[in-house]
């Protein structure tokens, strides 16, 4: 009996090798592009699932400046557009119409190692009343409370823009000092700790970056220590002046040049499904008869296992107010038969080949192999949180690039 079994396997293997050399008709390789308007129930289900994949428990509702971008999202847009072309081929690349903030080489290096980047807007709206000695000091505060627990900051920068001072001599210099606020008092000025001082030329123009990595980690681990920053500017003669006189742009300056903070994070892989979505899986399955699946739109003519096109539009989901980029991405999906013989283009595993042969002899007990992704790629999503901070996050295994029989 054993010899007959192996003889049959040998015969089927020979037939498989002969069939694998055949070439598909080119029409079979044409993508099946699915695009239709979602029904309300489908839309809600898709919104829940995608929010779960993005690691969000609700839809962010940021407070925006009449649709205008300030410096923080523009900087993040530049980071987003600096992603690899391989990754961006699966998404709609966002082209900014504004003058952007030009990330430094150091920022791009941080981006390469980071899984998430967050920018933070300055929360100070009105200058507090300071003593005459510090009347020209300016303060900045950033809310780091929304950072997920357990995520470490690998790099952080305070960025402030300096314009050319035309009314001053080109050789004139200013001393810019950045301080950490370490203590507050009701009856006197705050206690300051000098982080860095830098000599600036009057004719100098561009973004100034200050490393606050250690300080940011302190703020995350000990929120009570997050009392913000202060800056001061002195002339070469030692006189304290308004930072604006040295060309430093404050919160009343152009939106695209306002100061902000950016932090780079190394995070663990996002859980594909949260407890919420697992708990509702049974309910979703009970309602499945009322929702047409992708297979329903592609089951009339079953073809061999291959990749099919599927585009997810964030705009169609009504998320264009909080997702900056991309407008959508080509998620794609795998569908088709893994029937004998398995052609070479099916990317079948050795196990799938054997399973197919055994299925032919015992179809009741051994199922056919499944058509599943063999290559998945990441995408990056740029979005606002509830505090109008901008987050750039990489999400793994979001795009199907190849399919095969498993």
Model-derived features with residue positions:
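Secreted, disulfide-rich extracellular signaling modules
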Residues: 2-406
């Amino acid at each position: 009996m054993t010899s007959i079994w192996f003889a049959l396997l040998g015969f089927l293997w020979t037939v498989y090798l002969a069939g694998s050399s055949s070439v598909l008709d080119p029409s079979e390789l044409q993508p099946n592009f699915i695009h239709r308007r979602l029904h309300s129930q489908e839309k809600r289900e898709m919104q829940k699932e995608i929010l779960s994949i993005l690691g969000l428990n609700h839809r962010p509702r940021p407070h925006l400046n009449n649709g205008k971008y300030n410096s923080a999202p523009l900087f993040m847009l530049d980071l987003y557009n600096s992603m690899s072309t391989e990754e961006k081929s699966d998404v709609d690349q966002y082209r900014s119409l504004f003058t952007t903030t030009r990330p430094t080489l150091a920022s791009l290096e941080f981006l390469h190692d980071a899984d998430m980047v967050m920018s933070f807007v300055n929360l100070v709206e009105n200058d507090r009343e300071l003593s005459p000695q510090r009347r020209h000091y300016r303060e900045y505060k950033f809310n780091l409370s929304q950072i997920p627990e357990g995520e470490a900051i690998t790099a952080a920068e305070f960025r402030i823009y300096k314009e050319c001072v035309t009314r001053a001599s080109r050789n004139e210099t200013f001393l810019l000092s950045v301080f950490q606020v370490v203590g507050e008092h009701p009856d006197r000025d705050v206690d300051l700790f000098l982080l860095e001082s830098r000599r600036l030329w009057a004719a100098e123009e561009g973004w100034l970056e200050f490393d606050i990595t250690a300080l940011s980690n302190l703020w995350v681990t000990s929120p009570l220590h997050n009392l913000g920053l202060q800056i001061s500017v002195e002339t070469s003669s030692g006189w304290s002046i308004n930072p604006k006189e040295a060309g430093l742009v404050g919160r009343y300056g152009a939106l695209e040049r306002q100061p902000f903070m950016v932090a780079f994070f190394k995070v663990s892989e996002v859980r594909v499904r949260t407890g919420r979505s697992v708990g509702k899986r049974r309910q979703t399955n009970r309602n499945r008869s009322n929702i047409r699946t992708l297979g329903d739109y592609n089951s009339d003519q079953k073809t061999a296992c291959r990749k099919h096109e599927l585009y997810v539009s964030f705009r169609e989901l009504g998320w264009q107010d909080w997702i900056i980029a991309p407008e959508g991405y080509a998620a794609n999906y795998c569908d088709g038969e893994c029937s004998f013989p398995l052609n070479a283009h099916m990317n079948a595993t050795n196990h799938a080949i054997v399973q197919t042969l055994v299925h032919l002899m015992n179809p009741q007990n051994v199922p056919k192999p499944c058509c599943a992704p063999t290559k998945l790629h990441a995408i990056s999503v740029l979005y606002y949180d509830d505090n109008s901070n901008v987050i750039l996050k990489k999400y793994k295994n979001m795009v199907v690039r190849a399919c095969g029989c498993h």
